[in-house]
Design a protein with these regions (language model features):
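Conserved C-terminal alpha-helix-loop-beta "cap" of PLP-dependent enzymes
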Residues: 130-202
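Conserved PLP-enzyme active-site core in the AAT-like
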Residues: 1-127, 132, 138
Length: 203
């Protein structure tokens, strides 16, 4: 899914098109999580931000890529990776990430459940205009694993003007910051953070 509107691309159909035109398909499963969705079957490379769901704390800067062993480009990918200088993580970061990996399945299950409960609560609230969440997205469901869920992220739009939105945001007793996938609830005014310099133009 995309961030922040959770729009879901039809990865299966795009994969067919990519194969037809001999183009490698690269996807990012950071928001969906490979514990929930099966994107590797349809991708040649899958990127993941280890800063987000994997670490669960948002205090480490790291990422990973998985090469599909069945990809026709696997040898070219390996050669390219061996030819570039990729910065290495420190030993402490690697040890920390290994510790994070021990309970990631438990955390993802909890995040899936908590986010879905919040989604259902918000979509029936009189002050909420729209809730964005992948539960009803056919494209997401087409690659959903048997025991997978819908992830840890949702977005919503409030009814009313900007002043009401500011008052609501400031009153929330939650951690606030630009990340996702933490073990604690985190809220972020995405439009303000991502498009601050464009707001006047957009209005």
């Amino acid at each position: 899914p995309s961030n922040p509107l959770l729009k879901c691309t039809n990865v299966i159909e795009i994969s067919k098109i990519a194969q037809r035109y001999n183009i490698p398909l690269i996807t990012d499963d950071t928001i969906g999580s490979n514990l929930n969705i099966n994107s590797l079957d349809y991708s040649d490379i899958v990127f993941t931000s280890l800063t987000k769901i994997f670490s669960g704390s948002g205090d480490i800067l790291a990422g990973s890529l998985i090469l599909n062993p069945r990809s026709k480009w696997i040898d070219k990918f390996k050669k390219a990776l061996n030819e570039i200088d990729i910065p290495k993580l420190s030993d402490n970061d690697l040890v920390y990430l290994e510790k994070c990996s021990r309970d990631i399945e438990f955390r993802v299950i909890n995040q899936n459940s908590n986010c879905l409960k919040l989604k259902k609560k918000l979509e029936n609230h009189h002050a909420i205009k729209t809730v964005f969440h992948p539960e009803n997205c056919p494209n997401f469901n087409s690659i959903l694993k048997r025991n997978g869920g819908y992830g840890c992220l949702l977005s919503f739009e409030l009814k009313g003007n900007i002043q009401k939105t500011k008052k609501f945001y400031n009153a929330l007793e939650l951690s606030k910051g630009p990340s996702l996938g933490t073990q604690f609830s985190l809220i972020c005014p995405y439009v303000l953070l991502a498009h601050y310099n464009e707001l006047e133009w957009a209005n």
